[in-house]
Amino acid sequence: MKQNIIIILFILLFSTTNTKACEVCGCGSSNTYLGLLPDFKTKFIGVRYQYMNYNTVMEMDASQFSHNYYNTTELWGGVNIGRKWKILGFVPFHFNKQIDDDGITTNNGLGDITFLANYKLWNKISVKGNSGISQQLWIGGGIKLPTGKFDVDVKDPAITVADVNAQLGTGSFDFLWNVMYTVKMGNWGINSTINYKTNTDKEGYKFGNKFTANSIVYYKIPQKNRWSISPNAGLLYEHTAQNTLGETVIDATGGYIANVLGGVEIGNHKISFGISAQLPFSQHNANGQTKLEWRGNGHITFAL
Protein backbone atom coordinates (compact mmCIF):
# COMPACT_ATOMS: atom_id res chain seq x y z
CA MET A 1 0.00 0.00 0.00
CA LYS A 2 2.78 2.43 0.96
CA GLN A 3 4.60 1.72 -2.31
CA ASN A 4 1.42 2.42 -4.31
CA ILE A 5 0.93 5.76 -2.52
CA ILE A 6 4.52 6.79 -3.28
CA ILE A 7 4.13 5.91 -6.97
CA ILE A 8 0.81 7.79 -7.29
CA LEU A 9 2.19 10.91 -5.59
CA PHE A 10 5.30 10.84 -7.77
CA ILE A 11 3.19 10.63 -10.93
CA LEU A 12 0.94 13.50 -9.81
CA LEU A 13 3.86 15.79 -9.01
CA PHE A 14 5.75 14.75 -12.13
CA SER A 15 2.80 15.63 -14.37
CA THR A 16 2.19 19.15 -13.03
CA THR A 17 5.62 20.79 -13.18
CA ASN A 18 7.22 23.31 -15.54
CA THR A 19 10.94 25.02 -15.35
CA LYS A 20 13.71 27.11 -16.83
CA ALA A 21 17.01 28.83 -16.28
CA CYS A 22 17.31 32.60 -16.45
CA GLU A 23 18.37 34.11 -19.76
CA VAL A 24 21.50 35.77 -18.38
CA CYS A 25 21.75 34.77 -14.72
CA GLY A 26 24.24 32.21 -13.44
CA CYS A 27 21.71 29.99 -11.72
CA GLY A 28 22.52 26.70 -13.44
CA SER A 29 20.41 23.56 -13.31
CA SER A 30 21.52 21.99 -10.05
CA ASN A 31 20.43 23.26 -6.67
CA THR A 32 20.41 20.75 -3.79
CA TYR A 33 18.54 22.36 -0.90
CA LEU A 34 18.29 20.31 2.30
CA GLY A 35 15.98 22.33 4.53
CA LEU A 36 14.60 20.46 7.56
CA LEU A 37 15.28 16.74 7.28
CA PRO A 38 12.57 14.29 8.46
CA ASP A 39 13.17 12.95 11.97
CA PHE A 40 12.97 9.24 11.16
CA LYS A 41 15.05 6.62 12.96
CA THR A 42 16.36 4.49 10.09
CA LYS A 43 15.51 5.18 6.44
CA PHE A 44 13.06 7.12 4.32
CA ILE A 45 11.94 7.82 0.76
CA GLY A 46 9.82 10.61 -0.64
CA VAL A 47 9.07 13.15 -3.33
CA ARG A 48 10.04 16.82 -3.20
CA TYR A 49 8.94 19.69 -5.41
CA GLN A 50 10.73 23.00 -5.91
CA TYR A 51 9.55 26.08 -7.77
CA MET A 52 11.63 29.16 -8.68
CA ASN A 53 10.66 32.17 -10.78
CA TYR A 54 13.26 34.59 -12.17
CA ASN A 55 12.63 37.65 -14.34
CA THR A 56 15.29 39.32 -16.48
CA VAL A 57 15.32 42.71 -18.21
CA MET A 58 18.42 43.62 -20.20
CA GLU A 59 20.06 46.78 -18.89
CA MET A 60 20.92 48.18 -22.33
CA ASP A 61 17.61 47.28 -23.99
CA ALA A 62 14.44 46.93 -21.91
CA SER A 63 12.63 45.36 -24.88
CA GLN A 64 14.77 42.24 -24.34
CA PHE A 65 13.32 40.33 -21.41
CA SER A 66 12.73 36.82 -20.12
CA HIS A 67 10.48 35.18 -17.56
CA ASN A 68 12.16 31.99 -16.37
CA TYR A 69 10.46 29.18 -14.46
CA TYR A 70 12.28 26.38 -12.66
CA ASN A 71 10.08 23.51 -11.53
CA THR A 72 11.76 20.38 -10.22
CA THR A 73 10.20 17.14 -9.05
CA GLU A 74 12.73 15.13 -7.09
CA LEU A 75 12.77 11.60 -5.75
CA TRP A 76 14.84 11.60 -2.57
CA GLY A 77 15.76 9.14 0.14
CA GLY A 78 18.06 8.55 3.07
CA VAL A 79 19.36 5.81 5.30
CA ASN A 80 21.09 5.87 8.69
CA ILE A 81 24.06 3.52 8.95
CA GLY A 82 24.71 2.81 12.61
CA ARG A 83 24.52 5.83 14.90
CA LYS A 84 27.04 8.01 13.09
CA TRP A 85 26.35 7.97 9.35
CA LYS A 86 23.50 9.30 7.20
CA ILE A 87 23.45 8.72 3.44
CA LEU A 88 21.18 10.84 1.21
CA GLY A 89 20.30 10.58 -2.48
CA PHE A 90 18.48 12.97 -4.85
CA VAL A 91 17.13 12.20 -8.35
CA PRO A 92 15.71 15.42 -9.91
CA PHE A 93 13.49 15.85 -12.96
CA HIS A 94 13.49 19.38 -14.41
CA PHE A 95 10.73 20.96 -16.46
CA ASN A 96 12.14 24.15 -17.98
CA LYS A 97 10.17 27.01 -19.45
CA GLN A 98 11.29 30.41 -20.65
CA ILE A 99 9.06 33.16 -22.01
CA ASP A 100 11.01 35.96 -23.69
CA ASP A 101 10.86 38.48 -26.52
CA ASP A 102 11.65 35.68 -28.98
CA GLY A 103 8.83 33.36 -27.83
CA ILE A 104 8.53 30.32 -25.58
CA THR A 105 11.10 27.54 -25.15
CA THR A 106 10.97 24.41 -22.98
CA ASN A 107 13.45 21.74 -21.94
CA ASN A 108 12.38 18.81 -19.77
CA GLY A 109 14.08 15.71 -18.41
CA LEU A 110 16.35 14.05 -15.88
CA GLY A 111 18.73 16.35 -14.00
CA ASP A 112 22.01 15.66 -12.22
CA ILE A 113 21.77 12.93 -9.56
CA THR A 114 23.40 13.76 -6.21
CA PHE A 115 24.62 11.62 -3.31
CA LEU A 116 25.62 12.94 0.13
CA ALA A 117 27.22 11.22 3.12
CA ASN A 118 27.12 12.91 6.54
CA TYR A 119 28.96 11.92 9.72
CA LYS A 120 27.74 12.80 13.21
CA LEU A 121 30.80 14.48 14.69
CA TRP A 122 29.26 15.58 17.98
CA ASN A 123 26.17 14.62 19.98
CA LYS A 124 25.53 16.19 23.38
CA ILE A 125 22.51 16.00 25.67
CA SER A 126 22.37 18.10 28.83
CA VAL A 127 19.74 19.21 31.33
CA LYS A 128 18.97 22.84 32.13
CA GLY A 129 16.18 23.43 34.62
CA ASN A 130 13.20 21.29 33.64
CA SER A 131 14.22 21.07 29.99
CA GLY A 132 16.76 18.95 28.19
CA ILE A 133 19.08 20.44 25.58
CA SER A 134 20.16 18.30 22.65
CA GLN A 135 22.91 19.33 20.24
CA GLN A 136 24.23 17.59 17.12
CA LEU A 137 26.97 18.52 14.67
CA TRP A 138 27.19 16.77 11.30
CA ILE A 139 29.86 17.13 8.62
CA GLY A 140 29.80 15.59 5.20
CA GLY A 141 30.20 15.77 1.49
CA GLY A 142 28.98 14.31 -1.73
CA ILE A 143 29.11 14.15 -5.48
CA LYS A 144 26.82 15.36 -8.25
CA LEU A 145 26.86 13.14 -11.32
CA PRO A 146 26.53 14.50 -14.89
CA THR A 147 23.32 12.59 -15.61
CA GLY A 148 21.41 15.65 -16.85
CA LYS A 149 21.55 16.49 -20.55
CA PHE A 150 24.21 19.04 -21.57
CA ASP A 151 24.44 19.18 -25.35
CA VAL A 152 25.69 22.63 -26.35
CA ASP A 153 29.02 23.39 -27.99
CA VAL A 154 30.43 25.86 -25.46
CA LYS A 155 33.14 26.94 -27.91
CA ASP A 156 30.60 28.04 -30.52
CA PRO A 157 30.63 31.88 -30.46
CA ALA A 158 26.88 31.88 -31.20
CA ILE A 159 26.12 30.10 -27.91
CA THR A 160 24.79 32.44 -25.22
CA VAL A 161 24.62 32.28 -21.44
CA ALA A 162 20.92 31.50 -21.85
CA ASP A 163 21.72 28.43 -23.98
CA VAL A 164 24.11 27.07 -21.35
CA ASN A 165 21.83 27.81 -18.39
CA ALA A 166 18.90 26.12 -20.13
CA GLN A 167 20.62 22.72 -19.96
CA LEU A 168 19.24 20.06 -17.64
CA GLY A 169 22.66 19.45 -16.08
CA THR A 170 26.08 21.02 -15.79
CA GLY A 171 27.82 18.28 -17.80
CA SER A 172 30.45 17.87 -15.08
CA PHE A 173 31.23 15.95 -11.91
CA ASP A 174 30.74 18.41 -9.05
CA PHE A 175 31.48 18.06 -5.34
CA LEU A 176 29.53 19.21 -2.29
CA TRP A 177 30.63 19.90 1.29
CA ASN A 178 28.32 20.63 4.19
CA VAL A 179 28.14 21.25 7.93
CA MET A 180 24.85 20.91 9.85
CA TYR A 181 24.23 21.98 13.44
CA THR A 182 20.99 21.34 15.32
CA VAL A 183 20.04 22.37 18.84
CA LYS A 184 16.76 21.41 20.55
CA MET A 185 15.39 22.66 23.86
CA GLY A 186 11.95 21.44 24.76
CA ASN A 187 9.72 21.96 21.74
CA TRP A 188 12.01 24.60 20.24
CA GLY A 189 14.76 23.88 17.75
CA ILE A 190 17.27 25.61 15.49
CA ASN A 191 18.76 23.98 12.41
CA SER A 192 21.72 25.68 10.70
CA THR A 193 23.44 24.45 7.54
CA ILE A 194 26.44 25.59 5.50
CA ASN A 195 26.97 24.13 2.01
CA TYR A 196 29.70 24.67 -0.56
CA LYS A 197 29.62 23.23 -4.08
CA THR A 198 32.79 23.09 -6.16
CA ASN A 199 32.27 22.53 -9.87
CA THR A 200 34.55 20.97 -12.44
CA ASP A 201 34.36 21.92 -16.12
CA LYS A 202 32.72 20.55 -19.25
CA GLU A 203 34.95 21.16 -22.30
CA GLY A 204 36.46 24.14 -20.50
CA TYR A 205 33.12 25.65 -19.40
CA LYS A 206 32.72 25.81 -15.62
CA PHE A 207 29.69 26.92 -13.64
CA GLY A 208 30.59 29.13 -10.70
CA ASN A 209 31.09 27.55 -7.29
CA LYS A 210 28.20 28.13 -4.89
CA PHE A 211 28.15 28.94 -1.15
CA THR A 212 24.87 28.54 0.75
CA ALA A 213 24.07 29.17 4.42
CA ASN A 214 20.70 28.97 6.12
CA SER A 215 19.29 28.88 9.64
CA ILE A 216 15.75 27.79 10.52
CA VAL A 217 13.93 28.15 13.86
CA TYR A 218 11.00 25.82 14.48
CA TYR A 219 8.51 25.02 17.23
CA LYS A 220 7.09 21.50 17.55
CA ILE A 221 3.43 21.37 18.63
CA PRO A 222 2.45 17.82 19.72
CA GLN A 223 -0.91 16.49 18.52
CA LYS A 224 -2.92 13.32 19.09
CA ASN A 225 -1.70 9.89 17.96
CA ARG A 226 1.98 10.96 17.86
CA TRP A 227 1.38 13.63 15.22
CA SER A 228 3.04 17.02 15.44
CA ILE A 229 2.89 20.38 13.68
CA SER A 230 6.11 22.39 13.39
CA PRO A 231 5.86 25.95 12.03
CA ASN A 232 9.27 27.33 11.07
CA ALA A 233 10.97 30.51 9.87
CA GLY A 234 14.51 31.49 8.96
CA LEU A 235 17.01 33.10 6.64
CA LEU A 236 18.97 31.84 3.63
CA TYR A 237 21.99 33.34 1.84
CA GLU A 238 23.52 32.16 -1.44
CA HIS A 239 26.55 33.40 -3.32
CA THR A 240 27.43 32.04 -6.75
CA ALA A 241 30.75 32.80 -8.44
CA GLN A 242 30.83 33.78 -12.10
CA ASN A 243 31.03 31.12 -14.78
CA THR A 244 34.24 30.73 -16.76
CA LEU A 245 35.29 29.41 -20.16
CA GLY A 246 38.93 28.50 -19.82
CA GLU A 247 40.54 31.57 -18.26
CA THR A 248 37.77 33.89 -19.46
CA VAL A 249 35.14 35.07 -16.97
CA ILE A 250 31.63 35.01 -18.43
CA ASP A 251 29.83 38.32 -18.04
CA ALA A 252 26.28 38.47 -16.60
CA THR A 253 26.71 35.35 -14.46
CA GLY A 254 27.02 34.86 -10.71
CA GLY A 255 25.70 36.97 -7.86
CA TYR A 256 24.13 36.70 -4.43
CA ILE A 257 20.70 36.45 -2.89
CA ALA A 258 19.35 36.70 0.67
CA ASN A 259 15.91 35.27 1.42
CA VAL A 260 13.52 35.19 4.34
CA LEU A 261 11.69 31.87 4.56
CA GLY A 262 8.75 30.34 6.36
CA GLY A 263 6.86 27.08 6.33
CA VAL A 264 5.28 24.25 8.27
CA GLU A 265 6.09 20.56 8.75
CA ILE A 266 3.43 18.00 9.75
CA GLY A 267 4.19 14.40 10.57
CA ASN A 268 4.53 11.43 12.88
CA HIS A 269 6.96 8.52 13.11
CA LYS A 270 5.83 7.10 9.74
CA ILE A 271 5.07 10.03 7.44
CA SER A 272 6.12 13.66 7.08
CA PHE A 273 5.01 16.40 4.73
CA GLY A 274 5.65 20.10 4.57
CA ILE A 275 5.64 23.29 2.54
CA SER A 276 7.78 26.42 2.64
CA ALA A 277 8.27 29.65 0.71
CA GLN A 278 11.20 32.03 0.29
CA LEU A 279 11.10 35.73 -0.56
CA PRO A 280 14.24 37.77 -1.35
CA PHE A 281 15.01 40.90 0.64
CA SER A 282 18.40 41.54 -0.99
CA GLN A 283 19.86 40.26 -4.26
CA HIS A 284 22.22 41.05 -7.12
CA ASN A 285 22.34 38.55 -9.98
CA ALA A 286 23.74 38.89 -13.50
CA ASN A 287 24.91 42.47 -12.98
CA GLY A 288 21.54 43.33 -11.44
CA GLN A 289 19.56 42.34 -14.54
CA THR A 290 17.99 39.17 -13.13
CA LYS A 291 15.73 39.07 -10.07
CA LEU A 292 14.26 36.17 -8.15
CA GLU A 293 10.54 36.64 -7.52
CA TRP A 294 10.08 33.79 -5.04
CA ARG A 295 10.78 30.14 -4.33
CA GLY A 296 8.48 27.41 -3.09
CA ASN A 297 9.18 23.93 -1.74
CA GLY A 298 7.03 20.97 -0.79
CA HIS A 299 7.58 17.34 0.10
CA ILE A 300 5.93 14.15 1.26
CA THR A 301 8.21 11.57 2.85
CA PHE A 302 7.70 8.07 4.26
CA ALA A 303 9.67 6.11 6.85
CA LEU A 304 10.67 2.63 5.66
Q: Where are the model-predicted features located?
A:
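Outer-membrane beta-barrel biogenesis signature
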Residues: 19-48, 52-56, 125-136
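Repeated loop/turn-to-beta-strand initiation elements of outer-membrane beta-barrel proteins
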Residues: 43, 84-87, 124-127, 187-190, ...
